[in-house]
Amino acid sequence: PAVAEEVRGVRENVGLMEITGFAKHEFSGTGARELLEKLLTNKIPKNGRIALAPMLNEAGKLIGDFTIASLTDQITEEEKFILFGSGIAEGYHQRCFLEHIDGNPTIRYRPLGNDMTGLSIAGPSSRDLLSSIASEDVSAESFRFLDIKNMSIGMIPSLVGRITFTGDLGYEIWVPSSLQSQLYELLTDVGKEFDMNLFGLRALDSMR
């Protein structure tokens, strides 16, 4: 019954879920794009875009299922990439990445761990909710499916991607861990106007 209520809330209005448990791997530096082109089966997306990114081993076996975001560092203006993937397999993937980097000093890799925390909103009212607190235009024309942008949510600097795995309209909002509680309080407060409810992994799995 609880899962059904969570699903109904997402399908009819908007739901909020924590996504910090996913692994976050950051790559930058000369050769980072080429390394990822080699490791992943998909074409690496253009700047400001997201793509699904499976990783295979030499035998063609699936060993990782990621979402990759192509970004520009706000300070250095350097190209960088973030791979979002399984939290359970985070250590295994770290070893794979380091093995392929093989000490290359021009490629910088770091697991972001809990330094980067995330919340996801999904459902037909998610755009209206986000639009009421975002510094950028998040209309369908300006913020397309699989776009990702830096913007302020309220006064909170955030990385926002238009992606969800619920089958509905939705967004992932990533912030430093020090700002997560502030973001949560903002979303839950504003979300009251949109009858927002919380949902968890069981509800998500039933909607995938």
Stretches with model-predicted labels:
Residues 1-208:
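Glycine/proline-enriched, intrinsically flexible loops and inter-domain linkers
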